[in-house]
Design a protein with these regions (language model features):
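HKD-type phospholipase D/PLD-like phosphodiesterase module
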Residues: 3-34, 38-183
């Protein structure tokens, strides 16, 4: 994202999932218009189910919710997990959705590794934290160490513009999900 310097932004550093998830889930809970979420990894563990719940609740409140996940980093979400979101109106997409040639992945090095969330065009979360319990301190010695920032202010519109320019067409996403579900 290329942005010009702008005054009036507020940035909060969030360390690991212990700080990131509560801040993000609360912000999604306050959303009044739109949530756009991109991530490399989203697992169906405790953290992933909590994210699922807050996005589902937002969609049921009439909030426009769009999700873009990497097809390699998040290949194992169940049809029920994703289907419940799409049934509620969530636009759900996979980046480069696992093409194979003779049963082998052909796209190992083409990934979407961004972790960005934009809420109501006023708040953004940007960083390195995926959606898995591995980012929580109670995961144990193998817990992942990472950071994100919560951003508020004029720069959020630049982040939003980047998101809107890089999200695939919504109708294409819905058709692809229907094809994947019926394979």
């Amino acid at each position: 994202v290329k942005c010009r310097w702008q005054e009036g932004n507020r940035i909060t550093l969030l360390e690991n999932g212990d700080q990131y998830y509560p801040a993000l889930f609360a912000a999604i809970g306050r959303a009044s218009r739109r949530v756009i979420l991109e991530s490399f990894i989203w697992f169906e563990d405790e953290v992933g189910r909590r994210l699922h719940a807050v996005l589902l609740e937002a969609a049921r409140r009439g909030i426009q919710v769009e999700v873009l996940l990497d097809g390699y980093g998040s290949p194992d979400l169940s049809d029920e997990f994703v289907g419940e979101l799409t049934a509620a109106g969530v636009i759900f997409r996979y980046y480069d959705p696992r093409p194979k040639l003779m049963g082998m992945r052909t796209n190992l090095f083409r990934r979407m590794h961004r972790k960005i969330v934009v809420i109501d065009d006023t708040t953004a979360f940007v960083g390195g934290i995926n959606y898995s319990a591995e980012h929580m301190s109670d995961y144990g010695p193998e817990a992942k160490q990472d950071y994100a920032v919560q951003v508020e202010g004029p720069v959020v519109l630049d982040i939003l513009q980047f998101e809107l320019e890089n999200l695939p067409n919504s109708e294409t996403a819905r058709r692809w999900w229907r094809r994947r579900r019926h394979q």
